[in-house]
């Protein structure tokens, strides 16, 4: 509260005179002017200033000189300090008035009533801006052509919507509030300074102009380097997304080390680029803080010069301008760090707007009734190459007509262009509109060019089932209901939708396994449907495509992962829904397309044969006939005699290979996580990086030195006030000396802050690098059940990897250095205050300190809670966005863009509501913490006045203490402004530390394991299952019990059975993804749990049902997980020849060096990817080869060649093969075939038959019924 100015009465003057035991001159026309003067210890009275002399500052100066010449030492004016008179002419009195005025200016800007809504508004604004810009980014991404989306990795998207959006949010919520508040104070200080002396203000501002020029030079460099750092962060986030999105492949290949090196390379690159900021920060802070403190020296020196020359009439003008400059310096010092954060936010915003402002796909056009889907689809001379491989033509003048209401099948070798036709029909790619482009030709839908149709309307007419179906991490009900988007049923109530969904699931043969799930249609399927088997996922995808009764149905290997009985039923359902609608089928299993109205045989990007099944079979030497012959079994069951009675008793197991995996692990994991306090957490991180102690020492010394600048400034200011005791040359000499001292302080501060900027950033990027490497390694070392938990989905992990080390870096860097400076400043201010006057310091410090610490505790505690809430919500929204981008083709084909954006908006809105409620109460805490310093100032000023009035304190002591309290209060305020950074860094550091192996994991790892040593001769492995039982945590019934299997060295063993019966689980147990609940599995006579993991997995090779490739060249993908010394070039080429992929690779312009790009999964066809994975598996020269539907995506010719190569290796006894297959033609030469089944619902799965292909056919049991299915007949 501002002090009121009260003109003293003569009665008050007489009272004061009596107290001083002195005489005072009285006159009706004169005001009371008096001071207690100290001279050689004796109090004296001095009185000066008449109405006449008050008119002239020069007379006052002369009269002042005469007083001093008479022996009076004018030190201070008690009365004017607290009952000020605007006409007072005594310089010390004026100095105290100036102090009071400037305190009023500062305090008026930061009252609780103003600060509370200010902080609240900025926090809410930051949350909303962050949410809106993320939503705009995702929306813009969905509006891009798929050719551009293929160039954006999931890791880049995750990094952008987490790390970069958090930077923007923090900048607005915390730093921008400080910036605007400081700018307002800056403007007020300049207005006051200009009001008192424009000349002095302008000259002083020249030093500040130096700050502006310096910032204009350094900030562009900061932004440029920050953008390079962001690019490096995107790269390592992209690698992390690939790794954790394909974690089973990575672990099975033993590729953790090689992929970690890739990740580490870009982490180190980010550190190197971050080091480039160290020098820029050093220069930036040197220029800024030197100029700021030099402005003190300039203001005082030039002000005294103007005063002596008579251009300034009163010394309080100099003091007022000086204080204004001090406020400006304090403000600019406080915004130095926020300014850097704002520049980072500007760089982050650039990454957002680069995509947001890019050109969008024009989705408008014709729709019903102007256009219709009940027409022919015609390809005319279509030529097409993918943007990622412009030198490799895919379609070469293709002409095809898909007749309305008819079923057209596309068959042919992998890579012949079948899926490309689907992509063009879905308008994921567009043919050229100009003759210069090599993508030429036309696609017509009836009379209309396909590009003239409304994009969303056209896609809503199509039901698509892809070869690798994608399910969202949602319920089964919602996953199927997504197929209703864009139809007349989209807005119907759930009761209506339920009927449609249940009908579609029945037709897709999915209802049977859904009903056996504990939660039925409400079951969460996990990331990409990980909690369901491949066949179950495919059936749900079929249900999703047929639920809307589309006019056009496209089936791209729609039944490849479904078991024999399931495929038969589903195929019959597809045949029914295909009637009277345009259907396009792509298949390698020719039995599924034999009833097609028209079959087109593709080869080399053109159609080489067309006709019906019967017509094509009659062509001697025809391509189609050769494909059919390649799929015949050696011994066929009677074709139709038992078909009608082939009702199997097999039933799908209710639980899938990864159904709600290890839910108890989640509870255990949560109990093991430790929520350490802030000091302990950061202290532990710093302690573990103690090898960097030289940087620690440099940061500590430089921040301590910078922190002493404020206390020294307080002392220097008091000395400057004492200068006014002198006159003449002595005044000039003293003024020049102390101005020089301020200049030397400016030099020292410039050097110290430069050191702070350089060393703090250098330290932070190194510790961040170490934390990020360790974090990645720790999560990569987690077992598969950890990754199966929903909160540990790949998107969430990538989000944490991108954000957590960054938060630690922010705190240990400049955001940690400035609080350190504030801490040392507070300590220094308290120390210097006590040294000049213990009584005033004691009262002020111990009255304010408890409130200060209470406010700090409350604020940091709130920020920790707020950060924990934010982290949980952002992880969910980021995972959702990453999942949607990863499934871009599925989202676009279902026209789910608006639904995805609505759901994403809902997630963000929920987060905003929670944050809004938190912020509403938190701003009161913020206001309280920032008001404590103001209360300390007021208390100091009041109690100091009492001490001055009682003549216990000299003015110098009062000024030093008061200035120290002001500076200490400002330091406390700056310290509190970093509370959010403390909370975020503590939460992030806790997650990093909690990712480390727990005590039980370390105990298990410390047990000595047997190391497997590879011999020179390649021999197969002997594997045995002894009474093995296995149950997932969520299952009441084991998946299987008492499993006994014996696989001899060099044998080819196959497992068949319905989807979900446990076939893939056998593979997972052999790979040690999971451990058996009971029983043992031996490898060459040794329990696999006693074998060292890495050497054991080196003996295995796995080819999964869904092949996974990584960014890099073809060579790098094939040799992934292998050291260069483990294979020769000849062995590499032979493995590719055995996998029937060598010819394709050599046909590419760059051969084995061909880069697969960011989206490696979409750069090749399914069959090409699968053959590369087979080549990768063969190159490892395993003793045990695991095949999980390994040839499901291959055409018949390729499959026959690949199968023959593996059979030859098995015959040589050089490896043992364990295969899981639905396509029985691939396992007819197996030494032993194990047939899984379930006796009754609710019981564990079991092996119902075993034997060779011929033995099982003669037994005419379950296997014979499978073979009797028409899918194996030509």
Curated annotation (Swiss-Prot):
Induction: Expression is induced upon voriconazole treatment. This is ABC multidrug transporter E. One of its GO terms (cellular component) is membrane. Keywords: ATP-binding, Cell membrane, Glycoprotein, Membrane, Nucleotide-binding, Repeat, Transmembrane, Transmembrane helix, Transport. Residues 120-344, 697-984 form the ABC transmembrane type-1 domain. GO terms for molecular function: ABC-type transporter activity; ATP binding; ATP hydrolysis activity; ATPase-coupled transmembrane transporter activity. It comes from the Eukaryota. ATP binds at residues 412-419, 1057-1064. The keyword Chaperone does not apply. GO terms for biological process: transmembrane transport. Signal peptide: none annotated. The chain crosses the membrane at residues 183-203, 205-225, 280-300, 321-341, 697-717, 737-757, 818-838, 840-860, 924-944. It is a multi-pass membrane protein. CDD domains: ABC_6TM_Pgp_ABCB1_D1_like (cd18577), ABC_6TM_Pgp_ABCB1_D2_like (cd18578), ABC_MTABC3_MDL1_MDL2 (cd03249). Residues 377-629, 1023-1269 form the ABC transporter domain. Belongs to the ABC transporter superfamily. ABCB family. Multidrug resistance exporter (TC 3.A.1.201) subfamily. It comes from Aspergillus fumigatus (strain ATCC MYA-4609 / CBS 101355 / FGSC A1100 / Af293) (Neosartorya fumigata). Its main location: membrane. Pleiotropic ABC efflux transporter that may be involved in A.fumigatus adaptation to azoles such as vorizonazole. It is found in: Cell membrane. Glycans are attached at residues 48, 473, 580, 792, 1044, 1117.
């Amino acid at each position: 509260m501002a002090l009121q100015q009260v003109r003293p009465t003569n009665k008050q003057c007489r009272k004061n005179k009596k107290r001083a035991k002195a005489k005072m001159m009285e006159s009706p026309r004169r005001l009371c002017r008096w001071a207690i003067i100290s001279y050689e210890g004796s109090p004296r009275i001095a009185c000066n200033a008449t109405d006449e002399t008050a008119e002239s500052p020069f007379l006052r100066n002369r009269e002042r000189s005469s007083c001093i010449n008479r022996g009076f030492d004018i030190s201070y004016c008690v009365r004017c300090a607290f009952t000020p008179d605007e006409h007072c002419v005594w310089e010390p009195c004026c100095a105290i008035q100036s102090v009071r005025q400037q305190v009023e200016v500062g305090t008026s800007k930061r009252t609780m009533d103003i600060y509370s809504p200010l902080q609240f508004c900025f926090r809410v604004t930051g949350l909303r801006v962050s949410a809106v810009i993320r939503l705009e980014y995702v929306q813009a991404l969905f509006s891009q052509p798929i050719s551009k989306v293929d160039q954006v990795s999931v890791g880049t998207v995750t990094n952008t919507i987490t790390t970069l959006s958090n930077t923007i949010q923090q900048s607005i919520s915390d730093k921008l509030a400080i910036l605007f508040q400081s700018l307002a104070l800056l403007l007020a200080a300049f207005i006051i300074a200009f009001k008192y002396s424009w000349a002095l203000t302008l000259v002083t501002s020249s030093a500040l102009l130096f700050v502006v020029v310096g910032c204009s030079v350094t900030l562009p460099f900061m932004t440029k380097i920050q953008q390079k750092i962001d690019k490096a962060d995107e790269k390592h986030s992209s690698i992390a997304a690939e790794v954790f999105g394909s974690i089973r492949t990575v672990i099975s290949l033993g590729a953790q080390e090689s992929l970690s090196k890739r990740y580490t390379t870009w982490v180190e690159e980010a550190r190197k680029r971050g080091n480039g900021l160290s020098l820029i920060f050093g220069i930036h802070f040197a220029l800024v803080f030197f100029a700021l403190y030099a402005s003190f020296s300039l203001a005082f020196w030039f002000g005294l010069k103007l005063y002596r020359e008579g251009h300034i009439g009163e010394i309080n003008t100099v003091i007022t301008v000086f204080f204004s400059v001090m406020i400006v310096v304090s403000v600019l010092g406080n915004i130095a760090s926020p300014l850097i954060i704002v520049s980072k936010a500007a760089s982050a915003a650039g990454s957002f707007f680069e995509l947001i402002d890019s050109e969008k796909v024009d989705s408008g056009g014709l729709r019903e009734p102007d256009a219709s889907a009940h027409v022919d689809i015609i390809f005319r001379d279509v030529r097409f190459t993918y943007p990622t491989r412009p030198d490799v033509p895919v379609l070469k003048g293709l002409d095809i007509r898909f007749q309305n209401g008819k079923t057209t099948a596309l068959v042919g070798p992998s890579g012949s262009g079948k899926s490309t036709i689907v992509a063009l029909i879905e308008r994921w790619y567009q043919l050229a509109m100009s003759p210069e482009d090599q993508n030429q030709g036309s696609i017509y839908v009836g009379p209309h060019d396909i590009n003239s149709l409304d994009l969303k309307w056209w896609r809503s007419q199509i039901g698509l089932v892809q070869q690798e179906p994608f399910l969202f991490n949602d319920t089964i009900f919602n996953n199927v209901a997504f197929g209703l988007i864009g139809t007349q049923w989209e807005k119907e109530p759930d009761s209506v939708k339920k009927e449609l969904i249940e009908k579609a699931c029945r037709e897709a043969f999915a209802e049977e396994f859904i009903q056996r799930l504990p939660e039925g249609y409400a079951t969460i399927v996990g990331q990409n449907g990980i909690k369901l088997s491949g066949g179950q996922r495919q059936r749900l995808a079929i249900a999703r495509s047929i639920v809307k009764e589309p006019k056009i149905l496209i089936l791209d290997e729609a039944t490849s992962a479904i078991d024999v009985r399931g495929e038969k039923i589903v195929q019959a359902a597809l045949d029914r829904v295909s009637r009277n609608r345009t259907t396009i089928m792509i298949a390698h299993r020719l039995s599924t397309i034999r009833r097609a109205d028209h079959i087109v045989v593709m080869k080399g990007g053109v159609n080489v044969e067309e006709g019906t099944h019967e017509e094509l079979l009659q062509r001697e030497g025809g391509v189609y006939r050769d494909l059919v012959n390649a799929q015949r079994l050696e011994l066929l069951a009677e074709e139709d005699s038992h078909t009608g009675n082939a009702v199997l008793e097999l039933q799908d197991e209710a639980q899938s290979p990864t159904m709600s995996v290890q839910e108890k692990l989640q509870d255990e994991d949560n109990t093991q996580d430790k929520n350490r306090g802030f000091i302990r957490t950061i202290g532990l991180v710093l302690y573990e990086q103690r090898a960097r102690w030289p940087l620690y020492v440099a940061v500590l010394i430089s921040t301590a030195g910078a922190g002493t600048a404020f206390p020294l400034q307080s002392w220097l200011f008091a000395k400057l006030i004492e200068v006014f005791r002198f006159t003449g040359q002595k005044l000039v000499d003293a003024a020049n000396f102390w101005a020089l001292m301020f200049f030397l302080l400016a030099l020292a501060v410039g050097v110290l802050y430069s050191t702070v900027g350089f060393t703090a950033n250098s330290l932070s990027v190194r510790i961040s690098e170490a934390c990020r490497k360790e974090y990645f390694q720790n999560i990569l070392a987690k077992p598969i059940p950890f990754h199966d938990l929903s909160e540990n989905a790949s998107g969430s992990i990538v989000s944490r990897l991108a954000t957590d080390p960054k938060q630690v870096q922010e705190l240990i860097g400049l955001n940690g250095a400035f609080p350190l400076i504030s801490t040392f400043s507070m300590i220094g201010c308290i120390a210097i205050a006590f040294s000049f006057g213990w009584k005033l310091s004691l009262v002020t410090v111990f009255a304010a300190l408890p409130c200060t610490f209470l406010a700090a505790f409350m604020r940091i505690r709130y920020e920790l809670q707020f950060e924990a809430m934010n982290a949980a919500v952002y992880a969910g929204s980021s995972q959702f966005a990453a999942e949607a981008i990863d499934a871009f083709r599925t989202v676009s084909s279902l026209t789910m863009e608006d639904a995805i954006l609505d759901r994403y908006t809902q997630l963000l809105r929920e987060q905003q509501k929670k944050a809004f409620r938190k912020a509403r109460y938190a701003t009161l805490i913020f206001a309280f913490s920032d008001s404590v310093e103001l209360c300390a100032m007021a208390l100091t000023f009041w109690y100091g006045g009492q001490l001055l009035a009682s003549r216990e304190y000299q003015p110098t002591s009062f000024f030093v203490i008061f200035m120290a309290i002001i500076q200490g209060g400002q330091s406390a305020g700056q310290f509190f402004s970093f509370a959010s950074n403390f909370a975020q860094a503590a939460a992030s550091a806790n997650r990093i530390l909690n990712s480390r192996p727990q005590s039980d994991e370390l105990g298990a790892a410390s047990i000595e394991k047997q190391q497997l040593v590879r011999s020179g001769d390649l021999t197969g492995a002997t594997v045995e299952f002894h009474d093995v039982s296995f149950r997932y945590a969520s299952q009441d019934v084991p998946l299987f019990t008492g499993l006994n299997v014996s696989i001899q060295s060099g044998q080819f063993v196959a497992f068949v059975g319905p989807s979900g019966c446990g076939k893939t689980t056998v593979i997972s147990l052999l790979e040690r993804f999971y451990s058996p609940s009971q029983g043992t599995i031996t490898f060459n006579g040794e329990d696999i749990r006693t074998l060292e993991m890495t050497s054991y997995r080196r003996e295995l090779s796995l080819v999964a049902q869904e092949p996974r490739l990584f960014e890099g060249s073809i060579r790098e993908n094939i040799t992934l997980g292998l050291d260069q010394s483990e294979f020769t070039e000849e062995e590499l080429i032979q493995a590719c020849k055995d996998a029937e992929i060598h010819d394709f690779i050599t046909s590419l312009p760059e051969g084995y060096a061909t880069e697969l790009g960011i989206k490696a999964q979409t750069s090749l066809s399914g069959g090409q990817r699968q053959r590369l994975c087979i080549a990768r598996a063969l190159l490892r020269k395993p003793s045990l080869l695991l095949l999980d539907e390994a040839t499901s995506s291959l055409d018949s010719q390729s499959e026959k060649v690949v199968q023959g190569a593996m059979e030859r290796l098995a015959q040589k006894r050089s490896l043992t093969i364990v295969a899981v297959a639905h396509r029985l033609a691939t396992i007819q030469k197996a030494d032993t075939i194990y047939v899984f089944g379930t006796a009754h619902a609710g019981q564990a799965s079991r092996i119902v038959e075993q034997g060779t292909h011929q033995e099982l056919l003669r037994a005419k049991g379950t296997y014979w019924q499978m073979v009797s299915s028409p899918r194996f007949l030509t």
